[in-house]
Design a protein with these regions (language model features):
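Sequence/structural signature of beta-propeller domains
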Residues: 2-8, 13, 20, 26-317
């Protein structure tokens, strides 16, 4: 797969966000950055403070210049938002509408969200401990239909990644412990069955270690993960020295995944992962590709500085 790591990005001052209030940035055109560097424009706030970050995201629609998405937040206390609907105009504003949570106990530390292929309007969110929530959204809330636990959880695993891919008539899942500094991320992959009526069922699990090519200090090797239509693994990585930063991030192509012809999954990790973009000053924890485009959306959890969204070219057509 050939893609330019040319990044389009923009800077916006943070703006206060109340529930369902649009947060705007100055309207300005995104300007290209040199390959491998960070543009300093276009970031749009999703709110101020620790509870307003974005820890996972899926795009649900696109209407002209506006992108619709669902985002999860890694909040832990009662009364704090876990899931929100976002209408986002790149470089201009984000309208964030918190959603409720029904059908299960309120999750703690949601870190990823993914669409369920073949089940319109259905999603899976996964918390850092490895608990998954299969749900639909309606009437201002998530309605949980099933919970499950990821298989083969290793000691010390802290999950920030969960993605699904449907290829050759077979469904597979990839999830990952984030890793930390000298401890690499562990990628897990397995076939998965998600019947209309019944529980999630995982097949045999394949594991591979993964180290981010960038950043190199205080690094989480896998802060989010998405799978392209061709099976490429797009991974975010982040430097997190503490709640006040300074943060640094990258998006890189880590390898490939595909259900194999038997009952397993072929998981390949690149020897030298390709950095597709670097993003200084932000802690990227969410990736989402736009359908039919090389552009994707980045979401950040910048802790005390809140959260932000931006677009960049890191996807394949």
């Amino acid at each position: 797969m050939h893609r330019s790591p040319l990044i389009r990005a923009c800077l916006a001052g943070a703006a206060a966000l109340g529930a369902g209030v649009a947060v705007a940035a100055p309207a300005q055109a995104a300007t290209p950055a040199a390959p491998g560097t960070t543009g300093d424009h276009g970031w749009v706030s999703t709110g101020d403070g620790m509870t307003s970050g974005v820890s996972g995201m899926v795009v649900t629609g696109r209407h002209g210049g506006e992108i619709d998405a669902l985002v999860v937040r890694d909040n832990k206390k009662a009364g704090e938002n876990r899931l929100a609907r976002v209408s986002y105009r790149p470089g201009r504003q984000a309208d964030v509408r918190p959603l409720g949570w029904q059908g299960s106990s309120t999750p703690v530390d949601l870190e990823s969200i993914e669409k369920v292929p073949g089940h319109e309007g259905e999603y899976i969110a996964v918390a850092s401990e490895g608990k998954g929530y299969r749900f639909q959204v309606g009437h201002g809330a998530a309605h949980v239909r099933e919970t499950f636990t990821l298989p083969d959880i290793g000691e010390g695993d802290n999950f920030e990644d969960f993605a699904l891919t449907y290829r050759h008539g077979k469904l597979a899942a990839v999830w990952a412990d984030r890793g930390q500094d000298e401890r690499p991320s562990t990628l897990y992959a397995a076939r998965i069955s998600l019947p209309e009526h019944g529980a999630a069922d995982f097949g045999a699990v394949t594991e591979q270690e993964l180290r981010a090519p960038y950043p190199t200090e205080n690094v989480r090797h896998a802060s989010d993960l998405k799978i392209t239509d061709s099976g490429s693994l797009l991974v975010g990585s982040a430097s997190d020295p503490g709640d006040d930063g300074p943060f640094d991030s990258a998006v890189y192509e880590a390898g490939t995944v595909s259900p194999d012809r038997s009952h397993g999954v072929s998981l390949h990790v690149a020897k030298d992962p390709e950095v597709l973009g670097k993003f200084a000053g932000h802690k990227i924890e969410a990736l989402a590709c736009l359908p039919g485009s090389r552009e994707g959306v980045l979401g950040t959890d910048d802790e005390n500085a809140g959260g932000a969204l931006n677009t960049a070219r890191f996807c394949e057509r």
